[in-house]
Amino acid sequence: MKNGKRVYLFIILLILISAATYIYVTMFMPSSKRVDHSTYYGVKDKQVAIIYNDGLQKASAIEQDKEVYLPYDWAVAILNDKLFWDSEENLLVYTLPEEIIYMDENYISDGKKAFIKSDNSAYVSASLIKKYTNVNLRSFTDSDIRKIYIYDNSVSLVSARLKKKSKLRSGETIKADIVADLDKEESVYILGSSVTDGDLTGKNKKWLKAYTDKGDWGYVKVSALENMDYVVNISEFVKPTYTSISFGEPVVLGWHQVSNMDANKNMESLVARTSGMNVISPTWFSLSDNEGNYTSYASRDYVTKAHEMGLQVWGLVDNLSKKVSTVKLLKKSSVRKLLIEKLINDAITYNLDGINLDFEGLNAEGA
């Protein structure tokens, strides 16, 4: 009988030990599994993972000739909307306040091609992006898994040092897979929203998102860190100022239908029947093809008389001709450039105060 009780107690003890072991392993024992880096970063071959501020992006870049090239669509949507890709003429166009830069496939910026093409998509040089955008970047392209870190200069970046050996993990838990081993006194950089004002030390958090000097990215335990301090971003970027002209008062505009030169003679009698108008817009210019040409009924004498009557003259440009596809016209940088130059020349020739673009039927593709 006593032997039976002993066996029973032994079995109960084994069950308790097994349960305790299971609970410990499940809840408290750190994972020793390591991530597959290609799967973790979502890249392979010459693709480059993009970490922007503190987030891994779905889009990936390309490395070529020791330069990282960012996908145009992503760069414009996230970093700089002043860039324009002309797929018709394979030109990258950048608009500055006082000039427009046209970059073809041979255009070199800081020793690098401004863009490359892959699978019919455009990729923009990261160095070019940095030159014209208020960001800092750091790329790691010597390892099998390539990465580029891009962060706005307005985003906090904090450096820290490991006070003991630790692990960089794929999530905010010891059960998350290991991304990299961290050595004592190794430096890490804490990104973006992981650091908030008044919480430099991470005292309100157990884990912080960070990357290492080797380019690894993941989560590190706050308890393993010391010597946390803000990194001072040094950038030569000067944000351009895009100015505009204000009329200074409400615009009261009247259109004047002009379909031939003789119609210009009616301006004075038509204006006499109006009240409070300060701008007249004669329909002088009409696009005639997809190459930037247009018909013109402009008159210097008309403008002189209008000015004497206290009116500004804004020549109207329309796209009503059935021969014109405005989408095709606007897609080509050379045509847009020609059209702009011709309109400016006519504005100077006829002493116009402005140009009134009346392009109808534009959809999102042509906008």
Q: Language-model segments: which ranges?
A:
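Chitinase-like catalytic core of GlcNAc-active glycosidases
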Residues: 249-256, 286-367
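Primary recognition of N-terminal secretory signal peptides and signal-anchoring hydrophobic helices
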Residues: 2-194, 226-227, 234-242, 246
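SH3/SH3-like beta-barrel fold
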Residues: 185, 206-212, 220
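Alpha-helical scaffolding within the catalytic cores
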Residues: 234-239, 261-269, 297-302, 338-345
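Short, Lys/Arg- and Gly-enriched loop/turn segments at beta-strand edges
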Residues: 195-210
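Boundary/entry segment of secreted carbohydrate-active catalytic domains
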Residues: 165, 221-268
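Short, solvent-exposed loop/turn elements at domain surfaces
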Residues: 168-171, 197-200, 260-267, 288-291
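Solvent-exposed, polar/charged alpha-helical surfaces in well-ordered, non-transmembrane soluble domains
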Residues: 73, 77, 127-131, 180-184, ...
